[in-house]
C-alpha cells in the first residue's frame, strides 16, 4: 500500500501517551501523519462544539516523533477534526484515526465519548475513520495496541470501507502474545449507578462530582448478527473487539410500536 495521509486526534489531550504511540506507529509504517488534538483533557465531551469562544491552535511537533506535524487545539475533539479538515491541512486525509483512548469505549458509552466523536466527524465528512481505545484506564503500554490499530485500518482500506462506516476498536490491556483473536462485535448496553457527590467550595457554594460506576452490561436488543459477541464480552475474553457503527440514528424497530399521536384532532402520520 502506498503511504497514506493520516489525521489523528483524541480526547485525552496532546500530552497523552496513547496518541503519541498511535502517531508514532503510523509514521513508522511510512505514512504521513498529522495530529490535531485538544490541548488538555477532554474526555466524555461527546460531539460538542465550541461556538461562544474562539478556538486557538498551536504547533506541538516537539511532543511527537520526527516528521509528524502536530497541533494542540483549545477546542473539543470534534472542533479539532473540523479545524484540521477545513483549515489546517492542505489536503484531505486518506484515513482518520482517533485514540488511543486511555480507557474503554464500549457499548452505549460511545454516545458520550469524545474519542468516538472525533472519528465520527471524519465519517460525517465521508472519510474512512476508526476510533481506538485501550480497555483499561491504568494500562500505559500502548505499543501493541498502536500496531494493531494501524494494521486493522490499513487492512480495511485495502478491501472496502463503505460510506458512513465508523470502526470502533477496543483492545484489552495485555501484551499481544497473550491476546485473543480480533472479532467483529455488537454494541452492548451499559447501565450505570449514577451518583453525584455534593461538596462545598471555599465560599460555601455547593458543587457536584459525578461518580457513577457501571453496574451491568446488557445484551444489545438492536441490530447485529446474534452469533457476534458483544464488545464487552469480547474484551472480558481478553480479545480485541471491532464494532461497526454509523451516524444514522433512525429507529429500526417495528413502526407499529411507535406512539399513536393525535394533535388538534388530527392523527400524526
From Swiss-Prot:
Top EC class for this record: hydrolase
Binding site for a divalent metal cation: 11-12, 43, 101
Subcellular location: Cytoplasm
GO MF annotation, one: exopolyphosphatase activity
Keyword Chloroplast set for record: no
Catalytic activity field: a ribonucleoside 5'-phosphate + H2O = a ribonucleoside + phosphate
Cited InterPro entries: SurE (IPR030048), SurE-like_Pase/nucleotidase (IPR002828), SurE-like_sf (IPR036523)
Cofactor comment: Binds 1 divalent metal cation per subunit.
E.C. designation(s): 3.1.3.5
Transmembrane segments annotated in the record for this chain: none
Superkingdom to which the source organism belongs: Bacteria
Keywords: Cytoplasm, Hydrolase, Metal-binding, Nucleotide-binding
Main location: cytoplasm
Cofactor entry: a divalent metal cation
Cellular component aspect of the GO annotation: cytoplasm
Region forming the signal peptide: none
Family: Belongs to the SurE nucleotidase family.
HAMAP family, per the entry: SurE (MF_00060)
Role of this protein: Nucleotidase that shows phosphatase activity on nucleoside 5'-monophosphates.
Name of the protein in its database record: 5'-nucleotidase SurE
Species this chain originates from: Synechococcus sp. (strain WH7803)
Organism ancestry: Bacteria, Bacillati, Cyanobacteriota, Cyanophyceae, Synechococcales
